């Protein structure tokens, strides 16, 4: 309930085919993250705002857990955007966004962003040989020696784009940059609109529950003010009384989308 379905499918169905395994824990429990780390663990991952439960990730504490075990913390900040949350300032090492959503703002492109804070020492242990050992594809270059904390993002560009085709079209990049120009203004309105609708639904007799960290009924209401001081996001989930049939009726009755 706290991980985007596409990400779960990538971890569980795609990466598992090439030998990667994933252990899942509740985002509110840093101790559980610590207990789940194994000798072969390479990365700790979480979403600033879980999808669809909207749980708020305790970035500082989970970053401390990851770093204590010599691991980087990767955070998906798609729902939060850089306007509402700065994960690197809170301890994350890597941040990813689906730029299709709030960053571009118009739903006309498909793209993603990876941000490397340059905070992780890839030479600190032997868990990352692709960065700490010679790479034949670049004349035995050792990325971590040559580029230091920027080794990850450099290899992502030099190898990932070159060999795996993750190269954004120029027009797509242009449209995302255009969207970024209005991100602060749009997020302010997105946040206020979402909270207004969530408050309305919370009082509606046909609604069983609403999950949004901006509501006092949400378990992370107070904590969200620390991680997301400018607003608890513009996405919420809700459950209807009447189950699946009630959901069908609601969707088919919508006149404005």
Residue ranges and their predicted role:
Residues 202, 206-257:
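Conserved C-terminal alpha-helix-loop-beta "cap" of PLP-dependent enzymes
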Residues 1-206:
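Conserved PLP-enzyme active-site core in the AAT-like
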């Amino acid at each position: 309930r706290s991980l985007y379905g596409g990400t779960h499918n990538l971890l569980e169905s795609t990466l598992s085919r090439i030998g990667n395994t994933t252990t899942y824990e509740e985002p509110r429990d840093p101790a559980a993250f610590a207990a789940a780390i194994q000798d072969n663990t390479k990365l700790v991952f979480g979403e600033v705002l879980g999808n669809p439960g909207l749980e708020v990730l305790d970035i500082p504490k989970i970053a401390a857990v990851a770093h204590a075990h010599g691991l980087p913390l990767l955070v998906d900040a798609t729902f939060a955007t850089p306007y509402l949350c700065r994960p690197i300032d809170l301890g994350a090492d890597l941040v990813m966004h689906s730029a299709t959503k709030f960053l571009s703002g118009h739903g006309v492109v498909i793209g993603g962003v990876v941000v490397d804070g340059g905070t992780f020492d890839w030479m600190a242990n032997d868990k990352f040989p692709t960065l700490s050992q010679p790479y034949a594809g670049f004349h035995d270059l050792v990325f971590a020696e040559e580029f230091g904390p920027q080794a990850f993002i450099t290899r992502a560009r030099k190898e990932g784009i070159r060999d795996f085709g993750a190269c954004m079209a120029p027009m797509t990049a242009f449209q995302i940059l255009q969207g970024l120009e209005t991100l602060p203004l749009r997020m302010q309105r997105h946040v206020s609109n979402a909270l207004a609708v969530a408050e309305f639904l919370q009082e509606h007799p046909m609604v069983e529950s609403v999950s949004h960290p901006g509501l006092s009924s949400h378990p992370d209401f107070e904590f969200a003010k620390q991680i997301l001081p400018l607003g608890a996001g513009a996405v919420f989930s809700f459950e209807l009384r009447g189950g699946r049939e009630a959901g069908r009726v609601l969707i088919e009755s919508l006149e404005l989308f």
